[in-house]
């Protein structure tokens, strides 16, 4: 009698040792009280950050900034993993110490951004597809050798109810691309972080965002199953359910918490170890408070934590200003924000970390990472 997997013509299973390694890494990334530092800004994106503090975008300055982040003593108490840009994975600081080693010193797992950016989907109104599947398997092998143990692939969708966005074509393209990426990563021992980001652009209500997010996540997990992705060895990086940035209707952090949790419960299998939210242009304080509201509704079948870039780094950059004499203070600010988000993963954040500057909006229209 044929086995069920043979009858169903199911995708080939991962070797047991690979599956075990992936599941172990995924669990470590979402261990209690910790989240992920997204420091994988492209060279073009980091230029925008440096322009804001009037700092030249040189390889030396980029290395100095990464050294500031990864050399922060005690960061590993709140941060489990760090997503790196390819340059950073192979980079050393001024003292000749590899950035990966700085992370290892804090028991932080190195990860790598593997997508190659966005292009327009033909026959759509500028909806986006993510590039990077060609040659991904070979790159994953090199990244693993260099010390990376997980990867990230970002897709974006836009809500525009008047134009019927996101279209079914866009959602399918997003889901299938994420699933192919995830499968390739797992075949090469990297835990895939699956990131279907629905941008906050536009005037749509929080209820519309909930409906669209539910549809997108449903399609993503269907595609993951069809591609044989081991859910126990993967993580999801979604947007929180929020109103569009131009929406005039008032919403509360409790609204964000309730609708985000409801959406996840309707779509995300409990086999997945965890969900690591993106901040999506929320202020540092909003990102912490909303994460707190989400976790206050627990217990949940998955860990619900953070994978923040701007919401962990904005005040750090403003404090640093590219000056060596500001490094120690900037590291204090990083620890303060990381601890705030750690508390939020327990639903115990009371607010107020970072003062007034933490409340500044970090929203960028049509955000490119």
Swiss-Prot record:
Pathway(s): Carbohydrate degradation; glycolysis; D-glyceraldehyde 3-phosphate and glycerone phosphate from D-glucose: step 4/4
Site (Necessary for preference for fructose 1,6-bisphosphate over fructose 1-phosphate) location in chain: 369
Positions of the catalytic residues: 195 (proton acceptor), 237 (schiff-base intermediate with dihydroxyacetone phosphate)
Effect of residue 49 to D/G: Abolishes binding to TRAP
Location of this chain's protein in the cell: Cytoplasm; Membrane; Host cell membrane
GO biological process: glycolytic process
Outcome reported for the amino acid change (mutating residue 313 to S): Severe reduction in the binding to TRAP
Binding site for D-glyceraldehyde 3-phosphate: 42, 45, 113, 195
Protein known as: Fructose-bisphosphate aldolase
Name of the encoding gene: FBPA
């Amino acid at each position: 009698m044929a086995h069920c997997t043979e009858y169903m013509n199911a995708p080939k299973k991962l070797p047991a040792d690979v599956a075990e390694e992936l599941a172990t890494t995924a669990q470590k990334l979402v261990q209690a009280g910790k989240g992920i530092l997204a420091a994988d800004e492209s060279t073009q994106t980091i230029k925008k950050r440096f322009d804001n503090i009037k700092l030249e975008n040189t390889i030396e300055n980029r290395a100095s900034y990464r050294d500031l982040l990864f050399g922060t003593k005690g960061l590993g108490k709140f941060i489990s993993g760090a997503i790196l840009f390819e340059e950073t994975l192979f980079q050393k600081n001024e003292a000749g110490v590899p950035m990966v080693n700085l992370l290892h010193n804090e028991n932080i797992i190195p990860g790598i951004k593997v997508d190659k950016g966005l292009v327009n989907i033909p026959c759509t109104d500028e909806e986006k597809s993510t590039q990077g599947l060609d040659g991904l398997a070979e790159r994953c092998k090199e990244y693993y050798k260099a010390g990376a143990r997980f990867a990230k692939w970002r897709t974006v969708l836009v809500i525009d109810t008047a134009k019927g966005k996101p279209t079914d074509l866009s959602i399918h393209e997003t889901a299938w691309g994420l699933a192919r990426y995830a499968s390739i990563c797992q075949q090469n021992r990297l835990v895939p972080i699956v990131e279907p980001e629905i941008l906050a652009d536009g005037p749509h209500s929080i209820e519309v965002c909930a409906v669209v997010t539910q549809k997108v996540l449903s399609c993503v997990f269907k595609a993951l199953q069809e591609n044989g992705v081991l859910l126990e060895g993967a993580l999801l990086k979604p947007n929180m359910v929020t109103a569009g940035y131009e929406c005039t209707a008032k919403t509360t952090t409790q609204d964000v918490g309730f609708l985000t949790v409801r959406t996840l419960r309707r779509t995300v299998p409990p086999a997945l170890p965890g969900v690591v939210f993106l901040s999506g242009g929320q202020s540092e304080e909003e990102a912490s408070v909303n994460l707190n509201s989400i976790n206050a509704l627990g217990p949940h079948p998955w860990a619900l934590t953070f994978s923040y870039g701007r919401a962990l780094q904005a005040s750090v950059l403003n404090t640093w200003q590219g000056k060596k004499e500001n490094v120690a203070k900037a590291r204090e600010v990083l620890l303060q924000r990381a601890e705030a988000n750690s508390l939020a993963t327990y639903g115990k954040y009371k607010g107020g970390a970072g003062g007034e500057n933490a409340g500044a909006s970090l929203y960028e229209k049509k955000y490119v990472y």
